[in-house]
Amino acid sequence: MATLSQDQKQLVQEKAKAIRVSIVQSVTAAKSGHPGGSLSIADVMSLLYFVEMNVDPSNPKKQDRDRFVLSKGHAAPALYATLAEKGYFPKSELINLRKINHFLQGHPDMKHTPGVDMSTGSLGQGISAACGMALAGKIDNADYRVYSILGDGELEEGQVWEAAMFAGHYKLNNLTAFVDYNGLQIDGDIEKVMSPLPIPDKFKAFKWNVIEVNGHDIDELHQAIEEAKAFTDGPTCIVMHTVKGKGVAEMEGQAGWHGKAPSEEQGVAFVNEIMGVQ
């Protein structure tokens, strides 16, 4: 399997840092939002959009594009930051996050936001839609792949497992799902709220190929995605061991930052921390 070049790896790391900066800035400006679970997926978002996926900001609806569905729709700040970084719309728009009548709503809206393939927010519906897209691709003999990111708390939704059963039954080998396994949800530790563990075994039971990785290691993520592309017997689930709030020490591993915005002073400090400014 092909490894990342140094240039590719550097690009992904630089874009992940830029995505994290934009997440903090946009949520701070909005005075509301979900920074913790947005920061935890910045690395995989950067890798997908700047290396792995076949997408074109100048033609966002092209038929042969790869599809992406953010099933954990509350992490919209990460998706918007990535889309802006990729060139779907100006980065200056990010400060309008969650403003009434703006195209960057609190959860992804496919009718108004360039580059968004599916409206999400109600947990469990995103992965279900991703399964439908993947099946449509099979029926049409299309070459595109479908990627979806789920939260670990989202796995408490029964609809997720209906979708998992569906994907395994139809052997949707053009579908790759990522689980953002940071161990925390809005009410605290996922094992105490409603444990979805063991996550790998559950997906394996539904005939998925399962790979576990460090969700902040670009090389591990890339190799897992390459393996998913090569696997022909069904869908792949990449379980990413991540840190909620990754990149901001005060947020890391803290459930309290699931849906809380930084103050203006904190926002400046957090951005400086991400950028390495003393």
Predicted regions and their residues:
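N-terminal amphipathic, basic-rich helices that act as targeting or association modules
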Residues: A2-A76
